[in-house]
Each structure stands twice: as structure tokens, then as C-alpha cells.
């Protein structure tokens, strides 16, 4: 690796506006470590951090990027490393940051910590050759995975697991409508629904993406067009009953349809609002159909260990895997942001370092 560099947001702007800068990596403080990154993965949060979020002040200048994997290069004084993690070893990063000592953290609900934040959003992240993170946020990389796969895994699979398992208690045989099946979190959700015995109906923007959803295990893959026609098709596929769970992250544009296709007593869980945060809300439909609505943000860090244990049960034929659409060089991070914003790919966008 050559000279250290990172991408910085000095003022909010459009996708691709972070600028490359040389820097000298700092040593880690007690409880923290420094990684020499080998790969980082982009998420929608990179774009929102770059563009700015109305009403939210971020600590600029800031290096975006919440997913990453690399080599453990330095350890802060007195720092205890997680199981399977050692100096010089290959590790990936759990992106959620919390205080570790409040009641929520102590009972394992770290994403409910009052100081909870995400790497690359509240402190410098992984769009860099090196990054500082708490030691508790490290996990060993499965032996047969590349750094690119490891970087693409944590945020989307942790988010999807929290939504399906802990917010909605997905049961075998239940049907889940997955909006944006070609996104990172959508492609993770399709695989987890199948692995947990559910039936996924994916919604995507093209026939090519629909084919890839089927390959991941979706029972049906619908090309989004007219939303009323889509709603009718979903009800047809479910015997007019509707779906048990709606996996929402698209927001305002799809919310009325999510309400319409949700079965009586069904659940809608949301982790995002890509098309906007405000939408008309039919309270009568909510109580008449007894729909349960649940918000979800990231997930419990310990559940990444649960996901790793599921992978280790069958390493030659894993039940799920990160889907990577394209790999850029880190030097082309700005271009990678613009590519992600265009939304034409299927799966995760990754930068190798």
C-alpha cells in the first residue's frame, strides 16, 4: 500500500463530492484499534451523509463509509480483543457505535443507546486506507471469504436480520414482500427469508433484476410499474389475503401500497425512506386491519456473531452471502458514489483498497 489517503466531506454536496486527501493515520486510544483497510462497501448512508440530512448536524469535516474489512494493524493500550481476532489478522467491522455502559448497551440493545451512531456518520469512516474503530466492533472474517465480501456483509445483513427476526418474528411459511429486492438490504432480506423458511415476493425495477431475485431464492419477483396493478398482483399471489410482512425501506412512494398489501394482523417494518420520509397515512386501514408498524435502525451487534455462526454450519454451501454488483478502486470512491446513486445495479457497491 502506498501513502495513506481518505475521502473527506468538508461541506455537504451531491454524490461524488467528497475530496481525496493525504493523511497520517493516528494511533488507537485504549479500547480502540487501527485497521489497514483492504476493502470498503458503500451504503445509502454514504450518500445521505455526503448530501446532508435536513435538521441533522454532522461533525464536518468527515470521512464517510460505514462498512469495511482489513488487517488489524495496531491495538490501543490495555485493549481486549474479541474471540478469534488477533493482531495482524483479517477482520470486518460492525458499523454501529454505542457507549457500552448504559442500561440499553448492558442488556444487548446497543442500537437503543442514547449515543448510538454509525461509523462514517458520527465519526470518520471507511472511505480511507486506514480507520480507527472500537475493538468490540471487530469480527473475524470467514475463512473462505474475500475482503470485498466481508466489507459488503455487516450493515445490510444486520439490518435485515433485525427487521425480520427481532422486529417481526418471521415464522416458517409466512410471506414477505421485499421492496427494492436489488438493493444491498433487499438482496440480504430475500436470502434470509428463504433461509428462515419464509416466502419472499421481491419488487424490483427490471426483468434482469427480477431474474437475479429468483436466483437468490425469491418465490416471486415483480417488476414495479403501476402500483395499483402491483397491489392487485400481490393479492392474487397470496389468495387475496395479503402478505404477512412488508419489508419497507423505500418510503413515501411505496407506503400506501405497503398498507394495501399487508394482511390483516400483518406487520410492516421499515428501516429507511429513500423516496422521502412523509406520506399520507390511513389510520382507518391501520386499525381496521390491525396492522403492526415497526421501525428498525441497524441491529444488535451480537447478532452479527449469530449470522457468522449460521454461515459456519455449512461453509461450502452457505444459506446466504453478500451480493456484490461492482468493485471500484478506493481512488475512484467519488465515482462509486455516483454509481450507487444511479440505482441501476443489483447488490452492493464495493471499493478495494
What is the role of each PLM region?
Residues 182, 190:
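N-terminal Rossmann NAD(P)H-binding glycine-rich loop of SDR-like oxidoreductase domains
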Residues 90, 175, 199, 266-267, ...:
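Short glycine-centered segments of the SAM/dcSAM-binding site in methyltransferase folds
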Residues 264-271, 281-322:
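Rossmann-fold dehydrogenase core element
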Residues 2, 256, 301-353:
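C-terminal hydrophobic helical "lid"/dimerization subdomain
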Residues 25-41, 53-106, 142-144:
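Glycine-rich beta-strand-centered segment in the early N-terminal region that forms part
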Residues 178, 194-254:
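Adenosine-nucleotide cofactor-binding segment
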Residues 97-180:
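NAD(P)H dinucleotide-binding glycine-rich loop of Rossmann-like/cofactor-binding domains
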Amino acid at each position: 500500500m502506498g501513502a495513506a489517503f481518505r475521502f473527506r466531506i468538508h461541506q455537504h454536496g451531491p454524490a461524488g463530492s467528497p475530496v481525496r486527501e493525504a493523511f497520517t493515520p493516528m494511533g488507537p486510544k485504549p479500547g480502540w484499534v487501527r485497521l489497514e483497510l483492504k476493502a470498503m462497501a458503500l451504503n445509502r448512508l454514504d450518500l445521505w451523509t455526503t448530501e446532508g440530512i435536513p435538521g441533522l448536524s454532522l461533525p464536518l469535516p468527515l470521512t464517510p463509509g460505514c462498512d469495511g474489512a482489513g488487517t488489524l494493524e495496531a491495538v490501543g493500550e490495555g485493549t481486549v480483543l474479541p474471540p478469534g481476532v488477533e493482531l495482524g489478522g483479517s477482520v470486518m467491522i460492525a458499523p454501529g457505535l454505542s457507549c457500552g455502559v448504559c442500561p440499553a448497551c448492558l442488556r444487548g440493545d446497543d442500537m437503543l443507546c442514547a449515543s448510538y451512531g454509525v461509523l462514517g456518520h458520527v465519526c470518520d469512516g471507511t472511505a480511507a486506507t486506514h480507520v480507527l474503530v472500537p475493538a468490540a466492533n471487530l469480527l473475524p472474517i470467514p475463512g473462505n471469504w474475500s475482503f470485498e465480501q466481508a466489507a459488503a456483509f455487516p450493515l445490510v445483513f444486520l439490518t435485515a436480520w433485525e427487521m425480520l427476526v427481532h422486529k417481526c418474528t418471521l415464522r416458517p411459511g409466512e410471506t414477505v414482500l421485499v421492496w427494492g429486492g436489488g438493493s444491498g438490504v433487499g438482496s440480504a432480506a430475500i436470502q434470509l427469508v428463504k433461509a428462515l423458511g419464509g416466502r419472499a415476493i421481491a419488487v424490483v425495477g427490471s426483468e434482469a433484476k427480477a431474474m437475479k431475485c429468483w436466483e437468490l431464492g425469491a418465490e416471486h419477483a415483480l417488476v414495479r410499474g403501476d402500483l395499483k396493478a402491483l397491489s392487485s398482483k400481490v393479492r392474487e399471489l397470496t389468495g387475496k389475503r395479503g402478505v404477512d410482512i412488508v419489508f419497507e425501506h423505500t418510503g413515501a412512494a411505496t407506503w400506501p401500497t405497503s398498507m394495501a398489501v399487508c394482511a390483516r394482523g400483518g406487520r410492516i417494518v421499515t428501516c429507511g425512506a429513500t423516496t422521502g420520509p412523509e406520506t399520507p397515512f390511513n389510520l382507518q386501514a391501520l386499525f381496521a386491519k390491525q396492522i403492526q408498524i415497526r421501525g428498525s435502525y441497524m441491529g444488535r451487534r451480537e447478532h452479527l456473531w449469530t449470522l457468522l455462526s449460521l454461515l459456519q454450519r455449512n461453509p461450502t454451501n452457505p444459506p446466504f452471502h453478500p451480493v456484490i454488483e461492482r468493485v471500484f478502486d478506493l481512488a475512484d470512491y467519488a465515482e462509486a458514489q455516483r454509481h450507487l446513486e444511479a440505482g441501476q445495479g443489483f447488490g452492493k457497491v464495493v471499493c478495494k483498497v
